Amino acid sequence: HVVCRRQRQMCIRDRDVVYANGAGPRLHHVAYHTPEIANVVHGADVMSSLGLAETMDRAPGRHGIGNAFFIYYRDPDGHRVETFTSHYNVIDIDHEPTRWDLSDLRRSQLWGFPAPRKWFNEATCFEDIPVHPPMLDAPPVTLEDFLEGWS
């Protein structure tokens, strides 16, 4: 990250590497930033017009951590790809940080349906690298769990 300070604000630029609980090491997804929500939606429209709507893996939603609007797809090789809007570009350093708890569903998604189970369990393995079990026992609430509660 490149962090710069200006007028009591902090901005973070460049790339993010996010570590999440789960079996690993594995690659969960790569992400592409778009400047506006309309760009993310336009991408979904283009995918649909090309007959690729079924590649949508999770969507649409807004992450609690970062407040980014997102859609996830699968590329032709099965890797998960996210398109998302800006997130935490400007942070007021006087603002009290939010402490997110693993049991708080809003950290992953502020609104919309939870992700399907496969979203949490499927990821790309690295060649010749053994996969280890998760370090924390924090089972997610999945779409399947959510829908089971309705029946």
Give residue ranges: language-model regions.
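Intrinsic, low-complexity N-terminal interaction/targeting segments
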Residues: R13-Y19
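Aromatic/pi-system hotspot detector in well-structured domains
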Residues: R5, R15, E82
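Long C-terminal interaction/binding lobes of large macromolecular proteins
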Residues: G24
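Vicinal oxygen chelate
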Residues: Y32-S151
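Single conserved hydrophobic/aromatic residue that forms the stacking wall/gate
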Residues: H1-I12
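Well-ordered beta-strand positions
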Residues: C4, A20, Y72-R74
